Amino acid sequence: MKSSVFILSLFLLLERQAAVVGQYGGTKGHFQSSSSGFMLGQKGHLNFGLKGGSEEAAEESIFMQSQHQMFGQDGGDMAQTSVSQEHTGVKGAAICRKGQVSQLKSQESQIKSFRQVKSSGQLKSGGSQLKSFGQVKSSESQLKSFGQVKASGSQLKSFGQVKASGSQLKSYGQMKSSGSQVKSFGQMKSSGSQVKSFGQMKASESQIKSFGQRKSQGGQLQSYGQMKSYGQTKSLESQAKSFGQVKSQSGQMKSSYGQRKSYGEETQLKSFDQDAQLKSYGQQKSQKQSSFSQVKSQSAQLKSFGQQKSLKGFSQQTQQKGFAMDEDLSQVRKQFDDDDLSVQQKSTQQMKTEEDLSQFGQQRQFGQERSQSYKGYLAQYRKKLQEQQQQKNFNQDNFFTKGGAGLYQAQLKG
């Protein structure tokens, strides 16, 4: 009887230990605790709640009552052995339970670190995505602005080319007008030099004529001097002859009174001849001078006529050249007016393009402000969406209510 009771109590004790081992993480796959309130499922998720503490206490009390009754019926010796065995089993169960609690705590810390790593990885990926999206947006805006700047640069280049062509046309017109002026000045200068050379030729001709006249006058004067010296020599000879005659006939003065009278008559006749010769020479001289003055006046008239003729021809040439210059100037003026009109049209077109560019810049600034406000709204929306996604990932198996999940998250963050 004692042996059967001992075997029965030993069997019950082994069954109790097996049940305790199954309860603390053996075959049933979950662990119950009245103090901690944690429960670890087979999937690896943490389940929280107050569960099973009173049931375990009731089972222990029922088992203890049955043991005490059995030990009371069978004998006092077996009661002491069963109580000691039960005490050792409870100690082992407590040790096993402590080990399971430590394992549970380590698993909970691992899960916390895994969740933190996962959330930080999601935050990093979301930040990198936002950064890449911002970079793409900035690159798009840069490309747009670069295209606009390139278009405005090409427009400015074309405007500069138009302006340069206008300035070149203006400078070409100025060069043409200056060239025509230089040509006309050169023609006038050449005509002036021709007139000067013609005047010099005329002056040289007049000088040659005056030199010839002077030479002829010198020859005439020389001949007049020769004639005068010949008359003087003649008179001297006659005087010498008369002196010799007077000297030879001085002794015969009284006897030759008639001879003296004849000598006086001869001298008077000689002096009269000399006076007549001098008068004829003065008449010849006056005639020559009058003819010289007539020739001089005729040459002066011819000279003035030639000058008038040359001046008339020169005036006709200058008139013809002036007409040609007026025609060239009218053509240049017409071309300059056309160029000025084209430059005015291009300047109005440029002002219009500048106004269009300013309006486009204002529209672009308004678009940039709108895009910045949209970026801020997009960042807020993404932040809110990320928070919602984190909450959803945390409570994806719906183990918690909405308030419980938020409370546990706040506790984890704290």
Swiss-Prot record:
Residues 1-22 form the signal peptide. Sequence repeats lie at residues 108-120, 127-139, 140-152, 153-165, 166-178, 179-191, 192-204, 205-217, 224-236, 237-249, 257-269, 275-287, 299-311. Keywords: Copulatory plug, Pyrrolidone carboxylic acid, Repeat, Signal. This is Seminal vesicle secretory protein 2. Pfam families: SVS_QK. Residues 240-259, 306-321, 342-351 have a biased composition (Polar residues). InterPro entries: Seminal_vesicle_protein_repeat, SVP_II_CS. It comes from Rattus norvegicus (Rat). It comes from the Eukaryota. Residues 277-294, 358-369 have a biased composition (Low complexity). The modification Pyrrolidone carboxylic acid is found at Q23. The keyword DNA-binding does not apply. One of its GO terms (biological process) is negative regulation of calcium ion import. GO terms for cellular component: acrosomal vesicle; extracellular space; protein-containing complex. PROSITE patterns: SVP_II. The keyword Nucleus does not apply. Residues 108-311 are annotated as: 13 X 13 AA tandem repeats. The repeating unit appears to be involved in the formation of the copulatory plug via a transglutaminase reaction cross-linking glutamine and lysine residues. The rat seminal vesicle contains six major androgen-dependent secretory proteins referred to as SVS I-VI. The SVS I-III proteins appear to be components of the rat copulatory plug, with the SVS II protein being the major component. Residues 170-228, 240-294, 306-369 are annotated as: Disordered. GO terms for molecular function: zinc ion binding.
